[in-house]
């Protein structure tokens, strides 16, 4: 995920979140895991629910969940839905991971803040089939305290 416009702390965050990329949960469960982990580490963010659409391909997905940290979007599940509804060829162009959603063909719209319920670690681990415990919380908390995350965390 080389992107010179991406702050190093978000590149590191993306690397940490690779541990749960294959968790057997959809966008609601995946963002629930990420949001809970970010809350635990003290990283300011918003868990969002809304519509994602691509006017060029007539793709529209509702409801869809994603995370926002400042101007950046975290979405590890859109590509799955694009592939299911539009095919593998179109899914290759769908955003994935952490990215700046401004100017993309896929538009994140009608988003409303959807904070996660406070769930116990063991319950999150259970619903994710053991993936939640794969997050390195020590490194995540260290990351949160090693950079001025507030520079990118002024949520829209």
Language-model features, listed with the residues they occupy:
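A structural boundary/capping signal
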Residues: 1-156
